[in-house]
From Swiss-Prot:
Protein name: D-aspartate oxidase
Gene this chain is encoded by: DDO
Swiss-Prot/TrEMBL catalytic activity: D-aspartate + O2 + H2O = oxaloacetate + H2O2 + NH4(+); D-glutamate + O2 + H2O = H2O2 + 2-oxoglutarate + NH4(+)
Ranges that cross the membrane: none
One GO-annotated biological process of the protein: nervous system process
Length: 341
């Protein structure tokens, strides 16, 4: 077989990072990224992009740590290069605070981020309602800059970008030999996955250039994340809610919660509301599937369902998806045994 034709469905952070990894690691392929939505219209564009990972209950901790570390190392290399501004990657220091002492005082990712330590009594004076905290430096990767940066790399490596809505993965047969499904919530339809559901997140993007440290309540519901051109204030976790329109009452409540942690935010200006739907399931779906219809075969690699951990885990899971794609390519390149009559 000559060139193996690969279609990547989805152009959020999963689709684009997987396309870049395949183009670097799987020789002799042509790559086409197909989506009906591109930056700035993806969930990844709304994400705060902080590298503080969630915990997936169905996934071994070592595997989660590997995904996070590979992502952190990839973005840390970018932040230490001339590409940092273009890619929208920065280092940011701050605090994660708790209203009661957690059962796990040191999370699994503590030795991946930089300078992780428990907060001192003096630091905790800033947060009188909280009794315990972590201080550390991590990375922030901003979708509105990072996605175009990835897109540029896909094209630079010879990949194509196609705007098209896919209703059924079989539409891609026989034009493509392998399909990588990075369609997030689209997998309800495209992969018949009833386990995936939206968790609605509403945030405010505000101007408050004096806020330099991130603050995150341990619930993950209230957070203040300073970025390159604005500060992200959050948030919400509304399971099963598909509504993409901002709710003014929720915005008021977010601002009030954030001001309780950082009173100077009362002076924030140019408030903009954003809503994203996190594609959530019990664990990330990262596996091969061979679709069969009559005599036709279509190898698919599924790579979706990261919930709130999309940007924190994306490069590690993209590398794993690429290994699965490589396995599919090897099978296609292995000649079928001739039948002995």
């Amino acid at each position: 077989m000559d060139t193996v034709r690969i279609a990547v469905v989805g152009a959020g952070v999963m689709g684009l990072s997987t396309a870049v990894c395949i183009s670097k690691m799987v020789p002799g392929c042509s790559i086409t990224v197909i989506s009906d939505k591109f930056t700035p219209e993806t969930t990844s564009d709304v994400a705060a992009g902080m590298l503080i990972p969630p915990t997936y209950p169905d996934t071994p901790i070592q595997k989660q740590k590997q995904w996070f570390k590979e992502t952190f190392d990839h973005l840390f290399a970018i932040v230490n290069s001339a590409e940092a501004e273009d890619a929208g990657v920065i280092l940011v220091s701050g605090w994660q605070i708790f209203q009661s002492i957690p059962t796990e005082e040191v999370p699994y990712w503590a030795d991946v981020v930089l300078g992780f330590r428990k907060m001192t009594k003096d630091e905790l004076k800033k947060f009188p309602q909280h009794v315990f905290g972590h201080a550390f430096t991590t990375l922030k990767c901003e979708g509105p800059a990072y996605l175009p940066w990835l897109q540029k790399r896909v094209k630079g490596n010879g990949g194509l970008i196609l705007t098209r809505r896919i209703e059924d993965l079989w539409e891609l047969h026989p034009s493509f030999d392998i399909v990588v499904n990075c369609s997030g919530l689209g997998s309800r339809q495209l992969a018949g996955d009833s386990k995936i559901f939206p968790v609605r997140g509403q945030v405010l993007k505000v101007q408050a250039p004096w806020v330099k440290h991130f603050i995150r309540d341990s619930s993950g519901l209230t957070y203040i994340y300073p970025g390159i051109s604005n500060v992200t204030l959050g948030g919400t976790r509304q399971k099963g809610d598909w509504n993409l329109s901002p709710d003014a009452e929720i915005s008021k409540e977010i601002l009030s919660r954030c001001c309780a942690l950082e009173p100077s935010l009362r002076g924030a200006y140019d408030l903009r509301e954003k809503v994203g739907l996190r594609p959530t399931r019990p664990g990330v779906r990262l596996e091969k599937e061979l679709l069969a219809q009559d005599s036709r075969r279509l190898p698919v690699v599924h790579h979706y369902g990261h919930g709130s951990g999309g940007i924190a885990m994306h490069w590690g899971t993209a590398l794993e998806a690429t290994r699965l794609v490589n396995e599919c390519v090897q099978v296609l390149r292995t000649p079928a045994p001739k039948s002995k009559l």
